[in-house]
A protein has these predicted regions:
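A metal-dependent, Asp-based hydrolase signature
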Residues: 48-83
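Conserved small/polar residues in nucleotide/adenosyl-binding loops
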Residues: 132-137
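Active-site neighborhood of HAD-like aspartate-dependent phosphohydrolases
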Residues: 2-42
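Short, well-structured alpha-helical segments
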Residues: 34-41, 79-87
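An amphipathic alpha-helix signature
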Residues: 22-23, 37, 41, 61, ...
Length: 142
């Protein structure tokens, strides 16, 4: 462990709770919010993989929008909630233990970074809200 100088994390589903956008709207979505959130995430991953296999790359935000549209239709969520859900996705909540873990690692002088399929703009917004001590990649494509 002495030779480890940096720790790299995935953002979505590791540092940030991808279900938190839907959870913040559970009063409007109702009891189906968790199923909806899980379906949205599953669809998002499926779209990413399929488009990659088909060599039809779309950036992560476009995939997020497309998967939200399909999920809203499947769960009969009012289309007026689309922009609210997308805005909340830009500022996903971190998992509750993450701030303390990152703080502890930073205090031990580890360099902390994110490696993600998220766009730099999305990652910058997430980190600006929650974790200014994380290093983000400067390249827009992985």
């Amino acid at each position: 462990m002495k030779n480890i100088k940096a720790i790299i994390f995935d953002a979505y589903g590791t540092l940030f709770d991808v279900n938190s956008a839907a959870e913040k709207c559970k009063d409007k979505i109702g009891d189906k919010w968790e199923g909806f959130a899980n379906y949205w995430r599953t669809t998002q991953l499926e779209y990413t993989w399929l488009r990659s296999l088909m060599k039809r790359h779309k950036d992560f935000w476009q995939v997020t929008e497309d998967s939200l549209d399909k999920s809203m239709k499947a769960y009969k969520i009012d289309s007026s909630m689309r922009n609210e859900l997308l805005d909340l996705y830009k500022i996903l909540s971190p998992f509750k233990e993450v701030p303390e873990v990152l703080k502890s690692l930073k205090e031990k002088d580890f360099k902390l970074a994110i490696l993600s399929n998220g766009t730099p703009a999305l990652l910058n917004e997430l980190v600006t809200v929650s974790y200014t001590h994380l290093t983000l990649p400067t390249n827009s494509r992985v």
